[in-house]
């Protein structure tokens, strides 16, 4: 029965074998490792490659989605068992220190129009932005990205060695190209109350491009949780525990850019039906154009 699991529905196999689910799972737990190697040889090879290609970032659920994308339909429990057998595990979430750019009321404070509506129906309609820092022995880098809250895609970003409005300007210039390419006529952009987002030029830029400005309430991180989740995942998957492996700030900057490219193009996500942000966007936009 074990060798048929990858090909047939579990319930059908149980009925044919006249076994209860509990009895089968008990026998499976007692199965020797060589049995798993023999029955799941193709899947084990795929799991090892997927985990390696993700730079050991994927846990069993993301590995499962990646397998599904390759036509291998194993459930999460089987993938978990096989990864345990292979002694593979993903990067574990952990808390991170949030960079704080709040300097009081130094400009315009916009209302919280987003109001924690983090699941827009269409791509390119609702965005979030913030800044985070990466510190190594040589110094610090600051990342300023904009995320599409529908697709989780980082649509524009800038990396700098110092925080300044020049960095925000560079990010906005790249964001402008995205808006033009996708013919975005109106959208919402959410941020915290950092001084950059109260700046007159930032507010005027949004208004000029017909973008609705929204801000978190003071000291309320969860109002901008989408971008915070991205920062947390990014740091767990490419930075924490690896700080000493970066030769210098140039090396760190390259790693940040490589990660964002990988995240957008390849990193699968449960929210996105097991697709990467870019693939989900393409699928969503195709669906919209066909309606």
Question: At which residue positions do the language-model features occur?
Answer:
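Basic, low-complexity segments
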Residues: 1-34
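Mobile genetic element proteins and their domesticated derivatives, centered on retroelements
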Residues: 13-14, 24, 47, 63, ...
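Basic, flexible linker segments flanking DNA-binding modules
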Residues: 22-122, 220, 276-285
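Conserved, non-catalytic sequence blocks in retroelement Pol enzymes and Pol-derived host proteins
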Residues: 36-37, 118-119, 136, 193, ...
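RNase H-like two-metal-ion nuclease catalytic core shared by retroviral integrases
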Residues: 102-105, 191-193, 199-200, 215-235, ...
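An active-site-proximal beta-strand-loop segment
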Residues: 116, 120-155, 161-165
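Active-site beta-loop-alpha junctions of metal-dependent nucleic acid enzymes
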Residues: 135, 158-182
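C-terminal domain-tail junction helix/linker
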Residues: 200, 207-211, 235-291
